[in-house]
Amino acid sequence: MYQPISTELPPTSFSSLMPCLTDTWGDLPLKVDDSEDMVIYGLLSDALTAGWTPFNLTSTEIKAEPREEIEPATIPVPSVAPPAETTTAQAVVPKGRHYRGVRQRPWGKFAAEIRDPAKNGARVWLGTYETAEEAALAYDKAAYRMRGSKALLNFPHRIGLNEPEPVRLTAKRRSPEPASSSISSALENGSPKRRRKAVAAKKAELEVQSRSNAMQVGCQMEQFPVGEQLLVS
């Protein structure tokens, strides 16, 4: 059972215990004539007798260590280069300009033609030219002569410049045939009889050539509706 601790301690015990307590805790505010202080003193005395050692409550100065400011870690973000603009170089197919009254021949030359309103829109051959511009200019000159200021032209700003006529492409002349050379020789050095025969042969040759030219012109002059346009393909 719990036995109350006697609060009455002899002066000798108090005087012998005080050095121990004062060495541990320093000066204790305990008074001998105070009953409550004596109760506390009795508890401490019993504890020391039982082998209890008070904690070392001596205040120790703690040196404040300098605080290291830790910067937040930055994760390097790889810079992504903007995608290079892919220029799709598309092959530009050059398209020839379309000119009024001009069409391209299969072998690359350009033919100029015009329709004559006085002949119900019959096509009139103007010639073959090296470039489409020359053929278009030939058409402009013919159209201006036919219709005047009402003509629809390819180069209206050039009609009053008095430019020379575009140069036509002519077929290569054939080499003289043996018959023609013989006719010429007979006309110069032959007898009168041979000369008469040579003259007759020359007339026949000229007649054949004229018929051939007439057939060629007839093939070129075909009927077309009035207002139709010929364009370079």
Curated annotation (Swiss-Prot):
Localization per record: Nucleus
Protein name: Ethylene-responsive transcription factor 2
Biased composition (Low complexity): 177-186
Domain notes: The AP2/ERF domain binds specifically to the 5'-GCCGCC-3' motif. The affinity of this binding is higher if the seventh amino-acid of this domain is basic.
GO molecular function, one term: DNA binding
Record's GO cellular component terms: nucleus
Entry similarity comment: Belongs to the ethylene-response factor family. Class 1 subfamily.
